Amino acid sequence: MIVQYPENVSPCQRFRFELYKDLLKKNGYLVTTKSFLDKKGYEVVHRYGFVLKKMSALLNGFIGRLLLIPQIGKYDFILLQREFAPIGPPIFEWLFIKLFQKKIIYDFDDAIWLPSVSEQNSLAGNFKNAKKVKDICKWAYRISGGNEYLCNYAKQFNENVVYNPTCVDTEKKYNVLANHDVEKITIAWTGSFSTLKYLAITENALKRLQEKYDFNIKIICNQKPSLALRNIQYVEWTEANEVSELASCQIGLMPLTCDEWSEGKCGFKLIQYLSLGIPSVSSSVGVNKKIIEEGVNGFFADSDEDWYSSIEKLILNADLRKKMGLTGRQKMIAQYSLQSNESNFLNLFSNNESDVLTLNHSTKTSLRKIINIKTVSNAIFRRENALNI
């Protein structure tokens, strides 16, 4: 797996690939992970300043990629998450695909063809190359997209496109239910610093609700929020606490702006909330409209009044929270769990180029028309394959 970050730190890696490592090994694959950044580099890359340390991390990352070249021959597949390097043209992608004839499975779970640079790395933004995404799509053996919007983009350049949703393990990890029989409820938001800005969308509604009701707001993140609200509990995210901290909450929030970048989001916050039986209120944008069923497992909110009224309904009715939460969990088990997606994920590594993976998660969208539906029984697997993950 060619990834950007060290193992066990990035949600897009943990829940899109690392989650399946045991499954791959069980099916005869030898798995190796190669990250661009080491742990020291990861610790500074999203912080302000540290220019010299960031430059050192970039240099080490490129050296690591160069050292891959003599090793690449032993791998049958390369699972590439986003890009070989965060800056520059797709040199490594071209080299490994065109020169070494490697089968690259190209995965992305954001609209990464759109320019996007964090404030902490504005200088590096001058060297980013979002346009390379379409080239990598053209060259890839297979493309794995986190939602239908991303798949439709990739389909412009490559017929071999797979809908591969982000999933959680609902049996071994996300296997507890939130307790809704509490005197004081807690409203949750979880995410990284890059999505913390969206929480401001809910601020006015939450402020009004706090004038009438007594509740806590729990923010699970790697950066403290800056909100003019009372009863905020900031919890620094760790892999060890992500489930237990969320499971102590009763309502989940997923606000987004209505734009192309949000269309590329894969709804992971909702998947986390609902897997734990937490009904959710979200913006009606992108994949949120597929995950949330209005009034069944959550509510949509696109104005201050929507946020206020939807959250208020859930604050006032514990039975409604329980019912919607259980319904949401059932949907996550059926459509967004590790167990439901195992065959779909394994089929990524079919050696038959005509195999394009199925939408195992029933949908009525146009994507069903453009992706051939095949079952895992039709896949051809080479046991004892070496897989660079």
Q: What would you call each of these model-derived segments?
A:
Residues 8-23, 33, 167-174, 180-248:
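Conserved catalytic-core segment of nucleotide-activated headgroup transferases in glycan assembly
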Residues 85, 197, 240-275, 282-290:
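Nucleotide-sugar-dependent
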Residues 294-305, 313-319:
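Conserved acidic donor-binding segment of nucleotide-sugar-dependent glycosyltransferases
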Residues 338-389:
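C-terminal alpha-helical cap of glycosyltransferases
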Residues 35, 105, 112, 138-175:
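Donor nucleotide-sugar binding/catalytic pocket of nucleotide-sugar-dependent glycosyltransferases
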Residues 62-75, 88-100, 106-107, 112-115, ...:
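Membrane-proximal helix-turn-helix segments that form the acceptor-binding/catalytic region
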Residues 37-51, 104-134, 169, 183:
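Acceptor-binding helix/loop patch of EC 2.4 sugar-transfer enzymes
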Residues 313, 320-335, 341, 347, ...:
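A short, well-ordered alpha-helix in the C-terminal region of glycosyltransferases
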